[in-house]
UniProtKB/Swiss-Prot annotation:
Belongs to the globin family. The keyword Metal-binding applies. It comes from Gobionotothen gibberifrons (Humped rockcod). This fish has two hemoglobins: Hb1 (major) and Hb2 (about 15-20% of the total). They display the Root effect and the alkaline Bohr effect, which is enhanced by organophosphate and to a lesser extent by chloride. Red blood cells. It comes from the Eukaryota. Gene3D superfamilies: Globins. GO terms for molecular function: haptoglobin binding; heme binding; metal ion binding; organic acid binding; oxygen binding; oxygen carrier activity; peroxidase activity. This is Hemoglobin subunit beta-1.
Length: 146
């Protein structure tokens, strides 16, 4: 993947100003609510029976934060994202058996929550850079499935 200097700057800026404790839980909660079949991978998280329960679930919040911190690794290794996520790809495919399409669903939810947080600052250029970055991460996480 080729990154322009502008794309690198946008991605770095987004993640350097991101409120992980806010964005992470909101993005994962949105994914679990909008795409309820994704809940099957979180059966150990307790009550996921409705939107209110999911939004208030401490395990969901903690995992959402963990996911965003995992994306930090990609931001710091933009020239080698596939290798950065190779071990995580193996874990999700061979042990957890996560449908790789779920990574795309979560990345879409992250984009929506970031867009809502940034408001007018979430320009088309910002969206393009963020979605490109997340698509590369999603591809890397799905490598083990191929």
């Amino acid at each position: 993947v080729e990154w322009t200097d502008k794309e690198r700057a946008i991605i770095t800026d987004i993640f350097s100003h991101m409120d992980y404790d806010d964005i992470g839980p909101k993005a994962l909660s949105r994914c679990l609510i909008v795409y309820p079949w994704t809940q099957r991978h979180f059966s150990g998280f307790g009550n996921l029976y409705n939107a209110e329960a999911i939004i208030g679930n401490a395990n969901v919040a903690a995992h959402g934060i963990k996911v965003l911190h995992g994306l930090d690794r990609g931001v710091k290794n933009m020239d080698n994202i596939a290798a950065t996520y190779a071990e995580l790809s193996t874990l999700h495919s061979e042990k957890l058996h996560v449908d790789p399409d779920n990574f795309k669903l979560l990345s879409d939810c992250i984009t929506i929550v970031v867009a809502a947080k940034l408001g007018h600052a979430f320009t088309a250029e910002t969206q393009g850079a963020l979605q490109k970055f997340l698509a590369v991460v999603v591809s890397a996480l799905g490598k083990q499935y191929h």
